[in-house]
């Protein structure tokens, strides 16, 4: 099985939309795909860590840890939606506008841009 991480590497992917809902202004949820398979980022309020593995356009994200800060309820809700969606991602694509689309088997999509 050949690993194909190259399109995902290269800086922060800032989350713009989580399953059809935009993110709260001036929040900074992001993902960074590392060459060694690590996944790091911010879920909105808390940092996250995990692993990523991709083959062709399939993608598996495994979350291993998050920090445990408490933030305003709206921020925690946004963060919860993202943390719930990420482990269910099965595919990705980078569209013509450069947006990263993370898709679950149920058709939910998170959108991010560099």
Describe each PLM feature range.
Residues 1-114:
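Lipid interaction determinants
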């Amino acid at each position: 099985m050949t690993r194909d991480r190259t399109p995902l590497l290269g800086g922060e992917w800032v989350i713009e939309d989580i399953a059809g809902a935009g993110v709260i202004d001036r929040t900074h949820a992001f993902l960074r795909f590392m060459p060694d398979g690590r996944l790091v980022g911010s879920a909105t309020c808390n940092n996250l860590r995990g692993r990523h593995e991709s083959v062709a356009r399939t993608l598996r994200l495994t979350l291993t840890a998050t920090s445990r800060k408490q933030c305003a309820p709206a921020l925690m809700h946004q963060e919860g939606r993202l943390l719930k969606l990420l482990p269910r991602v099965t595919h990705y694509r980078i569209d013509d506008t450069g947006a990263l689309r993370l898709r679950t088997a149920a058709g939910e999509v998170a959108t991010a841009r560099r």
